[in-house]
Amino acid sequence: LETFLSNGPVVLGPLDMGHLTYNPNHTILYGVDHFVTVYALDGQYLYLHDPAGFACMKVAFNDILEAWKAEAIDYKRGAYSMWGNFKKVKSPSQTQIYQETARITRDRYLDGQSNVLEYYAKAVAENGLNTEQKQLHQYFSFKLAAVRNLYLSKFLKDHDPEGARLKEELATLFGQAHLSCLKEDYQELAHLLYQIAEVDGRFRDLYVN
């Protein structure tokens, strides 16, 4: 880590958010993967920026080791993963970036399971949410999905206006889903999840068909 830091910031991860104790919600985030940027190391302390809204954190090195083991993160390639020595290797145009994004989007839809959202909506309508699901959605997943769809909508505006419109619609629906989850109105939440599935299906058709 010290060697990497001599050449610039270092990305640490995946980390298990449940062990990041500077986050007041950490106790309900065990098993959620995360990444942070370390910009300095001073004796026994790391200085890092966390994109979850925690900038300039001073964290004891030993306090982050448990998160860094990532024992509950399925896709990890071992403990204590990090990336550093970053160098810019190419400067693609905005069109090239869009074309690569479109390719990745298509591949992920083709490789993914179908009708997952519909099945989940049906389960929510029939059974509501258990404690683990409720905590995940209230503190993490729906608000993150809203933000990510909004970012992608902005990116797509110059390349795919219809895709941008659908992504903005998805952002709005995920925002509403967050509120329904807070109210524990599971029939309303299920209805929104069905809507999300329908809009996502239309977005999928733009890239797969």
What spans do the regions from the language model cover?
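Long non-globular sequence segments
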Residues: 123-209
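Conserved active-site-adjacent core of cysteine acyl-enzyme catalytic domains
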Residues: 1-90, 162-166, 175-179, 187-191, ...
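Noncatalytic regulatory segments and standalone regulatory/sensor domains
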Residues: 29, 41-147, 151-158
